[in-house]
Amino acid sequence: MIGYIKDAIQSGLYQDFWGEDSLLVDGFHECYGEQLTCEGFSAYPSSTDDNVVYVDIGGDSVHRFKITIEGV
């Protein structure tokens, strides 16, 4: 199930990014004062941990976020 959740998170992030009123684009501009472009955004699964999705935001100065999915 974790694989499906990871796929949904990645898909949702990309859908928001390409959407007309993107929370990611607005948030990036508000936090960093820059325009987020397609070259500056990536969401991908970890190559070493099946429960992790990484999100890289920002061109040259990448801000990396780690999303960990755990069952309870």
Provide a role label for each language-model segment.
Residues I2-I9, L13, W18:
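Acidic, low-complexity intrinsically disordered segments
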